[in-house]
């Protein structure tokens, strides 16, 4: 039996197990998946062609895909809970890594569940967020897609953040209240 775990680099950590199967008998074998403590692993999938509506100040209010907005390569998607402490804490954590995230140069798409929630967001409360952020509205169910594909148990618990790429691979997920989100994002980014 061969099992494997795909890494973000494209490499695969495989494990081969040999065993005997006897006639008329059930053979039980433990399924073992190798993991790397050093390299970023692919932990799920996400459609980079998923659509959202950028806020008007982003240049265009026409629906577009994450691929169109971010270009090829890795990107971050965050689904925000407006005026909720877990989201506020996450945004402050991200702001503390502004220089590193801007140096990385990839886009971060931060989404609100609807237009009303987007209107309640006070951007001025977070002046130090990276300039690579695109704000938008989740008009086409990105939050639900992430929750389903990543098998999140509490679909309504926000914020949700992922790092994914345009090959539809997810290498990082965070949901709800998290301490040190900015540091976790950068650790993953540096491992790519």
Model-assigned labels for residue ranges:
Residues 1-6, 168:
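A short tyrosine-centered beta-strand micro-motif
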Residues 32-45, 157-192:
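Thiol-/selenol-based redox modules, centered on thioredoxin-like
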Residues 75, 79-130, 142-146:
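Structural microenvironment flanking redox-active thiols in thiol-disulfide oxidoreductases
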Residues 130-134, 150-162:
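Structural micro-motif
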